[in-house]
């Protein structure tokens, strides 16, 4: 019987994926009631996405984490219309979600130069405000980073994800023979001969209870949300976190990983998934792989090995299952080809769906335009009587 085990709490180290900031729009400028002059509007506070920015850089550069825009200029005889206050721009990494103090999403920045208004400047003094300026908006915001990658590596600690990433890309993650080698996300790119690039994210190892924020919990799982596809990486010989925890076979790790994703967010199961069975260079690996394939073909026949609360509602259906060895390089080329094929198929499906939607909208638009009754205000042609 498979049981949930207690796990250790870990930190990301120097990696930061959330930050709390105070923002304030600038106050408006004074109006000039005698001449009807209007004060300038206060500056706005914007969050702007930059590819080379990190939240740690932002925190180090602005340790006070306060961002206030400039005040609008007062109206005066030589300039009755006061100039607008200087805007304040907060540089953030691409992939940031911005929420307010109540957790309400203000917006997301998913590509370079995306901009989001987070605190508006106050109006300048004018007739409407009795020529008195208004204060700028005050707002506490939370920046939450979710990595954007084509492929997200999913697996228990020490499954060989970091070794695999270094083998298929130019990334150089920390690699060692103990659990939790990866304590912060690592990004790499697979380069193909036709110059196609596919980004891969190696995330800290998932553990049982991650959906309840155990271990790295939500810090790990939230990054999976923005990957296009998932690549499960399992050790063919199984996994055991420590001598105090239960040993898991390769099949058990797949089922438990699937359950953790399901409990965190069900739609993660809708993502296309591949499975890389690692460490095939070990003794008896071929025999264990044969057993694993049989179990994956008929997973429900083996659910009696699990506690009821650890059985997923639906099991992950892998598009490709590839036996590999990140050490010897066995199966690496096949894996890269399968990743490329799977992503290309997914892109084609998305494009087809988009074109069908556009055609449907066009058809509906044309149908509505043809069926519209004549306008009541339309002028009818004059009747001509021929005598």
UniProtKB/Swiss-Prot annotation:
PANTHER family: DEVELOPMENTALLY REGULATED GTP-BINDING PROTEIN-RELATED, GTP-BINDING PROTEIN 10. It comes from Bos taurus. GTP binds at residues 155-162, 202-206, 278-281. Transmembrane segments: none annotated. Residues 149-344 form the OBG-type G domain. InterPro entries: G_OBG, GTP-bd, GTP-bd_Obg/CgtA, GTP1_OBG_dom, GTP1_OBG_dom_sf, OBG_GTPase, P-loop_NTPase. Keywords: GTP-binding, Nucleotide-binding, Nucleus, Ribosome biogenesis. GO terms for biological process: ribosome biogenesis. The lineage of its organism: Eukaryota, Metazoa, Chordata, Craniata, Vertebrata. This is GTP-binding protein 10. The keyword GTP-binding applies. It comes from the Eukaryota. GO terms for cellular component: mitochondrion; nucleolus. GO terms for molecular function: GTP binding; GTPase activity; magnesium ion binding. CDD domains: Obg. It holds the Pfam family MMR_HSR1. Belongs to the TRAFAC class OBG-HflX-like GTPase superfamily. OBG GTPase family. Residues 13-148 form the Obg domain. It is found in: Nucleus, Nucleolus.
């Amino acid at each position: 019987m498979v049981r949930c085990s207690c796990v250790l709490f870990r930190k990301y180290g120097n990696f930061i994926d959330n930050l709390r900031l105070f923002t304030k729009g600038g106050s408006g400028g004074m109006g000039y009631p005698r001449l009807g002059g209007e004060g300038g509007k206060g500056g706005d506070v914007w969050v702007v996405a930059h590819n080379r920015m990190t939240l740690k850089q932002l925190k180090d550069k602005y340790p006070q984490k306060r961002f206030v825009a400039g005040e609008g200029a007062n109206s005066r005889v030589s300039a009755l219309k006061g100039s607008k206050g200087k805007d304040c721009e907060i540089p953030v990494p691409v992939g940031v979600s911005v929420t307010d103090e109540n957790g309400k999403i203000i917006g997301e920045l998913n590509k370079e130069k995306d901009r989001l208004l987070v605190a508006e400047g106050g109006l300048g003094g004018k007739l409407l405000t009795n020529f008195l300026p208004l204060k700028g908006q005050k707002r506490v915001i939370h920046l939450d980073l979710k990595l954007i990658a084509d492929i997200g590596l999913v697996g228990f600690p020490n499954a060989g994800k970091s070794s695999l990433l270094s083998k298929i890309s130019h990334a150089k993650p920390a690699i060692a023979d103990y659990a939790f080698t990866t304590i912060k996300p690592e990004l790499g790119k697979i380069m193909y001969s036709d110059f196609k690039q596919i980004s891969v994210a190696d995330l800290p190892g998932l553990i049982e209870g991650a959906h309840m924020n155990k271990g790295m919990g939500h810090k790990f799982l939230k990054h999976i949300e923005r990957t296009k596809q998932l690549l499960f990486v399992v050790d063919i010989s199984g996994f055991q976190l420590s001598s105090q925890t239960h040993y898991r076979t390769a099949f058990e790790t797949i089922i438990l990983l699937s359950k953790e994703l399901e409990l965190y967010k069900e739609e993660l199961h809708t993502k296309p998934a591949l499975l890389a069975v690692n460490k095939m260079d070990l003794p008896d690996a071929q025999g264990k792989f044969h057993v694993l394939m049989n179990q994956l073909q008929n997973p429900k026949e083996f659910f009696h090995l699990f506690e009821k609360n650890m059985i997923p509602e639906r099991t992950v259906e892998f598009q490709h299952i590839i036996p590999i060895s990140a050490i010897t390089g066995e199966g690496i080329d096949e894996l890269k080809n399968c990743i490329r094929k799977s992503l290309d198929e997914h892109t084609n499906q998305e494009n087809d769906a988009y074109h069908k939607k556009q055609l449907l909208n066009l058809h509906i638009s044309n149908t509505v335009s043809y069926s519209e009754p004549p306008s009541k205000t339309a002028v009818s042609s004059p009747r001509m009587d021929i005598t």
